[in-house]
């Protein structure tokens, strides 16, 4: 179950069942309700709504709303498109935002439902896929909503509780992930023989038409593949909808300053079907380079070279002077012998 909250004059709490068959529930004081999938030909114990539909096709299903409070409960009912948040979780557009996908295709038979205390009510709905719908995965949700005034905070509280609606539209499925905008920054150490660290950033872009996550590998290496260092324990990317992007920042420790470094970000795309099984696809990767000059060591080497050069020049000068003195002594001795 996923719970998200946002306060912008309107506080929204959204619960989406994404992986577990436990019904989604909301509770606040004496107000409490839950939602679950109806038991029918699609299944008796589903975690969410999931369909495979051809363009122009229609499916009918039911969401069940249960009032667990002590007073009658009236809830608004509507559908909305899904998207991946900056935190990597699925959320749904608020009611004031226009939906163009699953949120527009999903039509509940009622726009509001009143449920007696301790009772349940069925909310039938239809999902109609347009003839011109793009093949592939589309995600949204069917929501119940209760708006209450919070006089202490001076805002309205819109509590939303819903279930995910996933639709795979028939046609050619093209699952593709791309690694884009790879950048490498090296952070050296003051020690002449110490290793530094690197920061690798890149963007994961779902360029296909299927819902995909990716298993990540990041490594930094020197020339000819030497001095390779890999990042440890990278989590999988969140499941991205077609067209979505996810920015990644990976720190890599203990990187040797190999003068010219190359960072490679590699992704193993993971395709999950309606049954929950995962299929790995062909890996994709991209690289970027950066300079990593060990300046302290370079300075020491330059000083050593300068010192050796000075010693050699001084020795050469002394040798020249000694030879000149010896030649003068020889000349003087010859003159004395002949005089």
Model-derived segments and spans:
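Beta-sheet-dominated interaction scaffolds and their linkers
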Residues: 34-69, 112, 179-195
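Short, solvent-exposed loop/turn segments enriched in Ser/Thr/Gly
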Residues: 56-62, 120-123, 135-141, 160-162, ...
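Membrane-proximal extracellular "stem/stalk" segments
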Residues: 172-306, 312-317
């Amino acid at each position: 179950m996923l719970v998200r909250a946002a306060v912008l004059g309107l506080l929204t709490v959204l619960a989406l069942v994404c992986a577990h068959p436990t019904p989604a529930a909301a509770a606040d004081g004496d107000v409490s309700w839950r939602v679950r999938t109806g038991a029918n030909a699609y299944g008796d114990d589903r975690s969410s709504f999931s369909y495979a539909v051809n363009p122009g096709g229609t499916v009918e299903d039911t969401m069940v709303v249960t009032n667990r409070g002590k007073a009658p409960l009236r809830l608004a009912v509507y559908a909305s498109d899904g998207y991946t948040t900056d935190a990597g979780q699925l959320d749904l557009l608020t009611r004031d935002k226009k939906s163009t996908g699953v949120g527009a295709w999903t039509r509940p038979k009622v726009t509001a439902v009143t449920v007696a205390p301790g009772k349940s009510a069925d909310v039938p709905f239809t999902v109609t896929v347009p003839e011109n719908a793009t093949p592939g995965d589309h995600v949204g949700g069917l929501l119940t909503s209760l708006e209450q005034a919070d006089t202490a905070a001076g805002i309205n509280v819109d509590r939303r509780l819903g279930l995910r609606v996933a639709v795979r539209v028939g046609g050619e499925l093209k699952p593709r992930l791309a690694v884009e905008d790879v950048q490498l920054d090296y952070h050296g150490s003051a020690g002449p023989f110490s290793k530094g660290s690197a920061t690798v950033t890149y963007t994961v872009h779902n360029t296909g038409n299927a819902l995909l996550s990716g298993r990540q590998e990041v490594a930094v290496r020197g020339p000819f593949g030497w001095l390779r260092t890999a990042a440890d324990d990278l989590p999988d990317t969140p499941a991205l909808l077609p067209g979505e992007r996810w920015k990644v920042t990976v720190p890599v420790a203990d990187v040797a300053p190999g003068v010219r470094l190359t960072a490679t970000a590699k992704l193993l795309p993971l395709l999950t079907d309606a049954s929950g099984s995962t299929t790995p696809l062909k890996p994709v990767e991209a690289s970027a380079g950066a300079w990593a000059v060990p300046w302290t060591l370079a300075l020491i080497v330059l000083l050593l070279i300068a010192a050796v050069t000075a010693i050699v020049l001084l020795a050469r000068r002394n040798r020249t002077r000694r030879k000149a003195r010896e030649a003068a002594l020889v000349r003087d001795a010859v003159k004395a012998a002949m005089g």
